[in-house]
């Protein structure tokens, strides 16, 4: 069950949150905070199904990708019921940006320069051949 600290913050484990993935109990995680959006499902401008797809898990990346307004961010605070337990925070997948940065920093120079250069030369030659036939 949920643990409580001295500051009266309720901590929920990922296992607990995963159980709340249906229309009668819809919880999700945004920036390590746990939200109960059950009563907001019908009022969500993007539709109920958008929230239900994210229910029981971390919706931080999708929330940020949509570009919610300041009003939406303020409204979301009213649905906070606690925080993700500190032990479970490392279990949440890294954002895609982090993964892309890691892949880009490990790729070699030829994938960034040689392949595009060769592709450009091939396209230029094909264009020259095509225009020379006319």
Swiss-Prot record:
Gene3D superfamilies: Cytochrome b5-like heme/steroid binding domain. GO terms for cellular component: endoplasmic reticulum membrane; intracellular membrane-bounded organelle. The keyword Transmembrane applies. The chain crosses the membrane at residues 109-131. The keyword Aminoacyl-tRNA synthetase does not apply. Residues 9-85 form the Cytochrome b5 heme-binding domain. Coiled coil: none annotated. One of its GO terms (molecular function) is heme binding. InterPro entries: Cyt_B5-like_heme/steroid-bd, Cyt_B5-like_heme/steroid_sf, Cyt_B5_heme-BS, Cytochrome_b5. PROSITE patterns: CYTOCHROME_B5_1, CYTOCHROME_B5_2. Belongs to the cytochrome b5 family. Cytochrome b5 is a membrane-bound hemoprotein functioning as an electron carrier for several membrane-bound oxygenases. This is Cytochrome b5. It comes from Equus caballus (Horse).
């Amino acid at each position: 069950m949920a643990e409580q600290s001295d500051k009266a913050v309720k901590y929920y484990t990922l296992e607990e949150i995963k159980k709340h993935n249906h229309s009668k109990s819809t919880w999700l995680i945004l920036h390590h905070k746990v939200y109960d959006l059950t009563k907001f499902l019908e009022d969500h401008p993007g539709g109920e199904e958008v929230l239900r797809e994210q229910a029981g898990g971390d919706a931080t990346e999708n929330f940020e990708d949509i570009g919610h307004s300041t009003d939406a961010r303020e409204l979301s605070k009213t649905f906070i019921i606690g925080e993700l337990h500190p032990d479970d925070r490392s279990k949440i997948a890294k954002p895609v940006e982090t993964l892309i940065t890691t892949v880009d920093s490990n790729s070699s120079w030829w994938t960034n320069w040689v392949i595009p250069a060769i592709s450009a030369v091939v396209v230029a030659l094909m264009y020259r051949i095509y225009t020379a036939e006319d």
